[in-house]
């Protein structure tokens, strides 16, 4: 994950995974001093003062940049932690939903098996009840009893 940061007039790209170490162990105040390989002549005191002021300004910008970069890195770390927490919650919720779906599917399968078993039995029972009702009605029908006795 890379981000752009502006510190004064310096625009830098910082890799946030390595950025914290780079910022914390980066340039020190002595890193901007003049090296011994410069020519043996020294600039005039006025020029030297201007250079020192510029170096001090750059060092302030560097410190400001370090603070901003560390703040941005901490913010990104916090955001990442929050996103990880939310992701874990969503994964748990998805697992619960999948479990409920499996349970519903299992109940549906059982329900279908029960219905497959009971529906033909219900039809048989209805037919049997109908026959019994018809027999009962015939046995209690007085006209039928009279006709039966006349036939004898």
UniProtKB/Swiss-Prot annotation:
InterPro entries: DUF4715 (IPR031678). The keyword Coiled coil applies. Residues 46-109 form a coiled coil. This is Coiled-coil domain-containing protein 182. PANTHER family: COILED-COIL DOMAIN-CONTAINING PROTEIN 182 (PTHR37364:SF1). The gene is Ccdc182. It holds the Pfam family DUF4715. One of its GO terms (biological process) is female gonad development. Keywords: Coiled coil. It comes from the Eukaryota.
